[in-house]
Structures are given as structure tokens and as C-alpha cells.
């Protein structure tokens, strides 16, 4: 249950304070700290697409002697974007989420489905990089796209282009 998971996470956090990287929470904290340091070295435009894995794993064999522990993902969507695309990427991510949230501010079941998809993605992105994972990324795209398309079709039954051409006349 949730209480057990939260309690276990705090226990792992305390263990990680004593010996970093030995628990799942400890590894995440280590990855987050390293991600912040990487962001500081290229804060505006980042290190480039696909650079996170290389940058996050380049010191692993030196420290542990084994590349098996290499994790090339900070398990945080904001940090992943910050490493790869800097502040510009983070602003683009937050702008996307903001537009999606505004899209689903209306009433009705479709708006609620879209809103739940966006909020779930934002919250889960604190502890993972779902937009970059194949299944979760496509699920988000499909859920938001279908819900937004349905809302648009309901609002403009004759089509958006027809409404735009009528407004020009």
C-alpha cells in the first residue's frame, strides 16, 4: 500500500545519507545531483539530444569498476530536458504542459480524461522520464491528442478551418 511505499522510501533515503548509491532512492539522489551539476555546465542550451546517457554514465566504470550499474537516465523529466536542452528545453516542456492543462480546463468527461493524463504525466515525471520512454510517451501523446481532438471537434463541429475562413470574411 501507499503508506508502506512511502515508509520504505524514507528508510532508503536515510540509508542513502550514510552510504550514497546503495539503495534505489540513493541512486536517484546521486543521479539528480549529477544532473544538476551537468545542467550548470551548459545551462542555456544544454549538451544536446541524446547526451544524458553518455554524460551520466561516463564516470561509472571508474567509480565502481563495473559498467553494470550504469543508469543513463536521471529518472526526472525536468532534469533530463535540462541536461539535453538546458533552460530552453525545460521552458518548452513546461510550456507544453501548460498548454495541455489549459486545453482541458472545461467541463465534461473528455476534459477530465485529458486533465488526468496531463496531471499524471507531470506528477510521475518527478520520479521518471516517461515522455522519453516508448510506451509511456506514446500513451501520453495518444491520450492528450485524442482528448484534445475530441474537444476541438465538439467545439467546432464544422471544423476549425471552416470557422477560421468564416472569421476572415
What annotation goes with each model-predicted range?
Residues 1, 87, 129-130:
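Helix-loop-helix junctions and helix-breaking kinks within/between transmembrane helices
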Residues 1, 165-169:
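Signature aromatic-anchored transmembrane alpha helix within multi-pass, membrane-resident enzymes
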Residues 1-19, 33-41, 49:
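A membrane-periplasm/extracellular boundary helix in multi-pass inner-membrane enzymes
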Residues 12, 31-34, 55, 77, ...:
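Generic recognition of well-ordered alpha-helical segments
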Residues 19-33, 41, 45-85:
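Long extracytoplasmic/lumenal interhelical loops at the membrane interface
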Residues 39, 82, 105-108, 126:
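Hydrophobic residues in alpha-helical segments
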Residues 84-119:
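Hydrophobic transmembrane alpha-helices and their immediate junctions
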Residues 96, 114-122, 126, 130-166:
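Transmembrane alpha-helices of multi-pass inner-membrane enzymes
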Amino acid at each position: 500500500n501507499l503508506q508502506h511505499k512511502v515508509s520504505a522510501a524514507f528508510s532508503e533515503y536515510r540509508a542513502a545519507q550514510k552510504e550514497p548509491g546503495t539503495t534505489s532512492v540513493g541512486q536517484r539522489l546521486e543521479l539528480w545531483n549529477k544532473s544538476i551539476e551537468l545542467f550548470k555546465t551548459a545551462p542555456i542550451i544544454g549538451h544536446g539530444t541524446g547526451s544524458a546517457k553518455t554524460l551520466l554514465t561516463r564516470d561509472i566504470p571508474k567509480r565502481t569498476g563495473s559498467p553494470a550499474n550504469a543508469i543513463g537516465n536521471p529518472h526526472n523529466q525536468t532534469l533530463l530536458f535540462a541536461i539535453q536542452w538546458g533552460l530552453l528545453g525545460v521552458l518548452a516542456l513546461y510550456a507544453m504542459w501548460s498548454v495541455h492543462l489549459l486545453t482541458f480546463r472545461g467541463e465534461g468527461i473528455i476534459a477530465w480524461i485529458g486533465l488526468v493524463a496531463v496531471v499524471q504525466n507531470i506528477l510521475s515525471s518527478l520520479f521518471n522520464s516517461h515522455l522519453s520512454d516508448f510506451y509511456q510517451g506514446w500513451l501520453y501523446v495518444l491520450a492528450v491528442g485524442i482528448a484534445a481532438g475530441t474537444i476541438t471537434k465538439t467545439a467546432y463541429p464544422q471544423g476549425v478551418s471552416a470557422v477560421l475562413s468564416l472569421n476572415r470574411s
